[in-house]
Amino acid sequence: MQEQYRPEEIESKVQLHWDEKRTFEVTEDESKEKYYCLSMLPYPSGRLHMGHVRNYTIGDVIARYQRMLGKNVLQPIGWDAFGLPAEGAAVKNNTAPAPWTYDNIAYMKNQLKMLGFGYDWSRELATCTPEYYRWEQKFFTELYKKGLVYKKTSAVNWCPNDQTVLANEQVIDGCCWRCDSKVERKEIPQWFIKITAYADELLSDLDKLDHWPDTVKTMQRNWIGRSEGVEITFDVKGYDNTLTVYTTRPDTFMGATYLAVAAGHPLAQKAAANNPELAVFIDECRNTKVAEAEMATMEKKGVDTGFKAIHPLTGEEIPVWAANFVLMEYGTGAVMAVPGHDQRDYEFATKYGLTIKPVILAADGSAPDLSTQALTEKGVLFNSGEFDGLAFEAAFNAIADKLAAKGVGERKVNYRLRDWGVSRQRYWGAPIPMVTLEDGTVIPTPEDQLPVILPEDVVMDGITSPIKADPAWAKTTVNGTPAMRETDTFDTFMESSWYYARYTCPQYQEGMLDSKAANYWLPVDIYIGGIEHAIMHLLYFRFFHKLMRDAGMVTSDEPAKQLLCQGMVLADAFYYVGENGERNWVSPVDAIVERDEKGRIVKAKDAAGHELVYTGMSKMSKSKNNGIDPQVMVERYGADTVRLFMMFASPADMTLEWQESGVEGANRFIKRVWKLVYEHTAKGSVAALNVDTLNDDQKALRRDVHKTIAKVTDDIGRRQTFNTAIAAIMELMNKLAKAPQDSEQDRALMQEALLAVVRMLNPFTPHVCFTLWQALEGEGDIDNAPWPVADDKAMVEESTLIVVQVNGKVRGKITVPVNATEEQVRERAGQEHLVAKYLDGVTVRKVIYVPGKLLNLVVG
């Protein structure tokens, strides 16, 4: 081997070897335990960023480790290739989304290879190809036939700039999450998949996911939002229909003093015909933000419709208001208000001078003080006629039973979860496989016309989808009858909901999945990605798996056994204020900084001399110009260094602070390992290790080697604390660097230690370890080498450290054989000069001995 570590030479050579040998290509093998390691597939935006590198390095470390345990490891990669950014980029660069996307895929594929990730490239897929989305289209038509797909007109969040529908989660402060345009409300027909039909199972099966983060499970539980309550029907004077409301607190029903309906409710619309104030209010609501997170904080407004509802138990008339906090698409579009015991209802009633009637006693049994806020806790009823004196559960049941007996109420389980709207009014997505016949009948595209192929050779005007702008594209015939194709495309969450299953059989032509292959590999053993996907992608991913199970394609109930959410990557952020007061963000690479003695940044400027404001560490982003290009770092230090730093700088699930000094430290460590192997191998061949003839120092060093193997194995395999595993290897390396190399057995022990170190580092730094393994004459390629196994015998301590106290004060420490008797320990303590001086001329009155730990001599 050469004396100097030159990553630029060895990395490309090793990568070529992997490519030629197809090292990471796998097939189903019933004789081996399988392990499916998956990182969330990237969107081909053009370049990898450090967030990608962190995600994929964690996955690669786990995959390589599991492979060394002898498992059949699948680690695939592909491209989540449909989506809006491609349309914007195509318009900007005067091209079409397809060529832009395919160019990006080619570029990013090279970047992934440059980082040395051990992917099975034979399974690579891009979700924008008809070979992929044809099966999704076919599956959609099958779901339609099962009654799990329907079309309805619904109020949507419409981004006028992107000309598309946004999910509630994509509306932030009333604006589009992507382009910041003001969002409008619009009624359009859309396709939905009935995820609500699986709400109960999606909820209960969370309990099976023992190895998913609790935070993600809690977010999904809250998102599904199961509640038990009562649906109550009110008659309304002068209105032909009844109003139905749902409540989880029927115990407070006797305190209901008004009803509130959504601005879009038919009752409000009817009242608005003779009420100009209400008509203006309805119009205002139509264009108001409705992202659920904002509902709680926005100002509550309403207008009295003039209608009166009849309380079904008291017969009292209560007013019906139109209010902006009631949504037509949630529940029935109407709610009952109990201002004495619900804070939102209380604020609204206070604002508009509506009746507030308390019906629950305070905890001390007194009437509640409602002068400043509602009493929202459960308690004992009063002011409720025949139900007075009942506590929550008894009151819930008594009132629910009474309403049911009168035929105006029924118990019901409700969900916050809404059906999944999958229509998008965009071009760059999979066409929805439905057609409309001349008589208006809507049917699935016949199987012999699938896939419905998206034309790729298009001209983008930045406004209208090319398939909407081209009337010829939509024209088709079904059984000789003219028909029109659906011109909406699927939400891109459709593609990312089942890709993990297609990886198990990407070339399969007979259907969506080859069940034999899918059931061999699934469920995924570990899925790695950001926590920002907790409710959308990860819920659809679980839902789709259950749909495929019920279609007979897979047998497991859940798609992934373990979920690991990696932390964000942070970097320093700097800006200077421009002439017009605007902030100009400067890359940390271009900042010249001064630090204090603790390493904190105290001053910064850029090459042009601008004084920079340092805003601290924040998530790498384009907006703050603080992203670090992985390619530049790989060219400067090598892929192994970047990978090692990524895994060492922070626990995998915590934020990682990008520090170039830390990268340099990782690079120095690799050079130290290289140097030690070089010096060791330069001395020529090595004799066999004879563990029976080792002296005490050699035994101690060998003990350290095997204790490190045990720790690293536990840290990577069970605890997944990769940073502590690396720290343990570094600590061992420090000891090995100081170990004498004088005798045959010294060198034989060094050979055993280095073969272990190189294998333990292999998942982190595979290129350098591949090379060092060859230099050490390890058997075969390191990619097929077994993980080192700790020798229990070597780890047995032959001596132990005893703390010696005189009258309870520590006076010394002694090393004794593990099997030493109390007499031998006392004798050895008396010989220790630090202890002996306290025993001079005194009598030992009592001895307290804790075997293997402590000797306390009481003297007087």
Curated annotation (Swiss-Prot):
One of its GO terms (biological process) is leucyl-tRNA aminoacylation. It catalyses: tRNA(Leu) + L-leucine + ATP = L-leucyl-tRNA(Leu) + AMP + diphosphate. GO terms for cellular component: cytosol. It is found in: Cytoplasm. Pfam families: Anticodon_1, tRNA-synt_1, tRNA-synt_1_2, tRNA-synt_1g. Its main location: cytoplasm. The keyword Cytoplasm applies. GO terms for molecular function: aminoacyl-tRNA deacylase activity; ATP binding; leucine-tRNA ligase activity. Its EC number is 6.1.1.4. SUPFAM superfamilies: Anticodon-binding domain of a subclass of class I aminoacyl-tRNA synthetases, Nucleotidylyl transferase, ValRS/IleRS/LeuRS editing domain. ATP binds at K622. A motif ('HIGH' region) lies at residues 42-52. It is an enzyme of class 6 (ligase). Belongs to the class-I aminoacyl-tRNA synthetase family. This is Leucine--tRNA ligase.
